[in-house]
């Protein structure tokens, strides 16, 4: 939850939006890292 809160700042998310999106797609494909990665880059959606 702490990470999610930190991600809530828009300016920060906008900067890493591309990087997050790319990594997220790659990670989400694998079941092992899916949870961790998706949670980490969740900021892209909100």
From Swiss-Prot:
GO terms for cellular component: nucleosome; nucleus. The keyword Repeat does not apply. Keywords: Chromosome, Developmental protein, Differentiation, DNA condensation, DNA-binding, Nucleosome core, Nucleus, Spermatogenesis. Testis. One of its GO terms (biological process) is chromosome condensation. It is found in: Nucleus; Chromosome. Its main location: nucleus. GO terms for molecular function: DNA binding. Protamines substitute for histones in the chromatin of sperm during the haploid phase of spermatogenesis. They compact sperm DNA into a highly condensed, stable and inactive complex. Belongs to the protamine P1 family. This is Sperm protamine P1. It comes from Hypsugo savii. The gene is PRM1.
């Amino acid at each position: 939850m702490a990470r999610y809160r930190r991600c809530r700042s828009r300016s920060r998310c906008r900067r890493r939006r591309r990087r997050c999106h790319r990594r997220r797609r790659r990670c989400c494909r694998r079941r092992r890292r899916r949870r961790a990665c998706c949670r980490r880059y969740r900021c892209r959606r909100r």
